[in-house]
């Protein structure tokens, strides 16, 4: 189930990839490719620009989750993840990263 309210989230799910056509269908974009499957299968759009990332909120298993596709290169993904984790007060053990 997906929601649109602005309440807190308990988990961050971060789909890592690199911007640009050079990496579009490579293993370096495994996280982005996984996010595309999640969007299709769950009917969610990860398209709200926030925290240097495309984001969407979802409720999965009764837990509020922020889905993130950082719009930085993988090596700089902390620029997106750290502010989101701080804003929502999500501890590191509640951050799931999907990458190659």
Task: Label each PLM-derived region with a short phrase.
Residues 1-99:
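Nucleotide and nucleotide-moiety/phosphate-recognizing core
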């Amino acid at each position: 189930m997906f929601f649109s309210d602005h309440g807190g989230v308990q988990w961050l799910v971060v789909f890592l990839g690199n911007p640009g056509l050079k990496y579009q269908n490579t293993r370096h974009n495994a996280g982005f490719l996984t996010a595309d499957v999640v969007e299709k299968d769950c009917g969610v759009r990860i398209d709200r620009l926030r925290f240097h990332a495309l984001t969407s909120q979802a409720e999965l298993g009764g837990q509020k989750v922020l889905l993130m596709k950082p719009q930085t290169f993988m090596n700089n993904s902390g620029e997106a993840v750290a502010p989101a984790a701080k804003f929502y007060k999500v501890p590191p053990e509640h951050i799931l990263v999907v990458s190659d």
